[in-house]
Amino acid sequence: APIYMCHPAVFGRVSELATRDDLPVAMHLAGSREEYYFVKRGSSSFSVHGESVRRGFIEIPPWLPTGVSPVRYALNWGAFESPNVLAIHCVHTDEEDVKKLKEYNVAIAVCPRCNAQLGMGVAPVDEFMRAGLRVGIGTDSPAATDSTDMLSEMRLGMLIQRAVNVGRFLDSESMLEMATIGGARAPKLDDELGSLEIGKRPDHHPAQN
């Protein structure tokens, strides 16, 4: 669930259980501008605008606003304490957020078609990769995109990154890596799958020229 739908104490408790039982954790984080402003300022289209007109859909909880970004909000409540955390989206992040994600070895799953279709923005993939984060590409769900077609996700993701990062854009080789071994590294499964190597589980997808 998005972090603004959860009591912040849930983050630390999930981390405790995940650490104890050696479980991975996946969380939607910093996906939209509305989420960013709701967490940081307590104001966005997610909140209730006035007592007489209810245009939002979430009451402002007593622990908001926090004055910090969604990444640092999650960090402050212990969301990154378990050893295998995957943050989905991470569109609205700044330099300090990226440093913290790296410090806590949090992996990133970017979902370009979902982000484009819902008007969420563009994830700073180039910054993630330069920081040495584990980055994979995901399709989100059919509720947010037209399909879960990975090849379509890769193509649109590459084109969007080329459009916003002129001169430092993502090439097809990097995108293929994100979709294969990068996607396996993100949840720490790269010793089992993600590349065609002896001892790994084969996972083939036929492609037609």
Predicted regions located by residue number:
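Histidine/acidic residue-rich metal-binding segments in metalloenzymes
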Residues: 1-107, 119-135, 191
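Glycine-rich phosphate/pyrophosphate-binding beta-alpha loops
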Residues: 2-5, 110-118, 138-147
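Residue-level marker of alpha-helix boundaries and capping positions
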Residues: 4-5, 88, 115-116, 170-171, ...
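Alpha-helix N-cap/helix-start and coil->helix boundary motif
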Residues: 32, 94, 115, 144, ...
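His/Asp/Glu-enriched, well-ordered alpha-helical/loop segment
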Residues: 76-82, 126-209
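Generic beta-structure capping elements
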Residues: 90, 111, 157-159
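Redox-cofactor binding/interface segments in oxidoreductases and associated redox assembly factors
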Residues: 109-110, 207
